[in-house]
Amino acid sequence: MLTELALGLFALWIAIFSQALHKIEEGHVGVYYRGGALLKAVTNPGYHMHIPFLTTVKSVQVTLQTDEATNVPCGTSGGVLIYFDRIEVVNFLSQDSVYAIVKNYTVDYDRPLIFNKVHHEVNQFCSVHTLQEVYIDLFDKIDEEIKNALQEDLVKMAPGLYVQAVRVTKPKIPEAIRLNYEKMEAEKTKLLVAQETQKVVEKLAETERKKAVIEAEKAAQVALIHQKRLLSEKETEKLLNQMEAESNLASERSKADAEFYKAQKQADSNKILLTKEYLELQKIRAIASNNKIYYGDSIPQAFVMGTTQQTV
């Protein structure tokens, strides 16, 4: 009987102990409710004890987590209703702010602070923009707009809860509109391809033009060099001819000077040589060597006047 009682008490103790012992995983903290009231105790990861049946344990994540809002409606300013398949909000809760946020918003704080706020901000954004802006022009800014709006409100409503990033999928639009947009994108792509092709053609034409300019400049430079060479040859030839002419002129002048000098000297020599006595001597010699006989009245004058009249 005592043995059975002891075994029963031991089993009861084991059951109570197993209910009292709980584990908090890494990256989480434990919060406790007793009688529906939140206790101020916040426990770290590990094993802990609590009073079974009176105290309830809740685990709250304090590392990065991703909250996902699905099928979020978006009514544009033009009256077209579209849906975002999925909007992901990456956030984390500071351990020091766990008690205050859980007390104000329960352990499901992400429902009022993130999910509901995402729907509200999406509607606010879509209501002031057209379908074109939401679907194409401003789509890359939606995530940043939602992130900034969420963080601005969290600073006021739940300090310690931070939004790291927001990811937004492409919205679903009515099929007819989607097909029109696809056609429009296809035409835009064709236009871009045509523009790029035109740029390539223009680039090639510009390259050919530059090549032609370079070739023309090269030909002009070659022609200029050739012309300069010809001019240089002409100038050299002219200079050589001029030098040759000057040399010939100098030679002729030298010859003329020599002839003039010779004639001048001969004249001076003759002037010195042809004296009156010498001329008389030569005349006598000429008469003496002349075997012709002269007759007439003018014979004496031949010797006196030096005339050459004769009669045979």
Swiss-Prot record:
InterPro entries reported for this sequence: Band_7 (IPR001107), Band_7/SPFH_dom_sf (IPR036013), Erlin1/2 (IPR033294)
Pfam families, sorted: Band_7
Main location group: endoplasmic reticulum
Disulfide bonds: none
Positions annotated with a glycan in the UniProt record: N104
GO cellular component, one term: protein-containing complex
Membrane-protein topology: Single-pass type II membrane protein
Membrane side Lumenal: residue ranges: 25-312
Tissue: Expressed in the germline only.
Keyword Transmembrane listed: yes
Subunit structure: Seems to form a multimeric complex.
Protein name: Erlin
Organism: Caenorhabditis elegans
